[in-house]
């Protein structure tokens, strides 16, 4: 289901992010859009790229897709944002590695007149014009509910949060912890 809806969401995302860039439409020049994500190798991001590539022709978009080699390299993302600013991008579609450490670069892009749309993983910036993502607190609660569907009398929980720098990682853990909090069987919660 997610793979079928994603191209539609990305087409809408492209249209929304380019609102206000009418000057390029009149001249026939393509919109310059950068898609800067957390990774270019996972199946999730490959499906996002497929949707963006499907929509770019319809919306006359010159699309540059960039992402670091690891999902921890927020500085590479910041450099890609600076590259988009230097290149005169009209819009950036962005998924933050760090909610806080990517904020200044996004603020700089917005100050340069670039429309910024966040997908999947948010950034602490007022310069973002649209956000598309999951209700991560609710997703965490749903995971907790599934984890509690056991007949065990005592439960010790270990949380491995590999996205602790991202807002979505923090919110998922928050929702998971909240979902566990009402069950007396939960004895201890460890986070690594």
Predicted regions and their residues:
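Sec-dependent N-terminal signal peptides of Gram-positive bacterial secreted proteins and lipoproteins
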Residues: 4-23
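A residue-level marker of the well-folded mature domains of exported/periplasmic proteins
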Residues: 21-192
């Amino acid at each position: 289901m997610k793979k079928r809806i994603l191209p539609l969401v990305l087409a809408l995302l492209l249209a929304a992010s380019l609102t206000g860039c009418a000057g390029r439409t009149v001249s026939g020049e393509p919109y310059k859009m950068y898609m800067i994500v957390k990774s270019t190798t996972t199946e999730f991001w490959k499906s996002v790229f497929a949707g963006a590539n499907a929509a770019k022709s319809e919306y006359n978009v010159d699309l540059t897709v960039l992402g670091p080699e690891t999902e921890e390299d927020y500085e590479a993302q910041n450099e890609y944002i600076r590259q988009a600013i230097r290149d005169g991008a009209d819009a950036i579609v962005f998924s933050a590695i760090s909610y806080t450490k990517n904020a200044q670069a996004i603020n700089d892009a917005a100050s340069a007149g670039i429309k910024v749309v966040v997908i999947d993983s948010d950034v602490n910036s007022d310069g973002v014009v649209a956000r598309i993502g999951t209700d991560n607190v609710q997703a965490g609660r749903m995971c907790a509910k599934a984890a509690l569907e056991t007949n065990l009398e005592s439960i010790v929980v270990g949380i491995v949060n590999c996205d602790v720098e991202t807002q979505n990682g923090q919110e998922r853990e928050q929702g998971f912890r909240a979902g566990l909090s009402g069950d007396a069987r939960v004895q201890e919660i460890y986070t690594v």
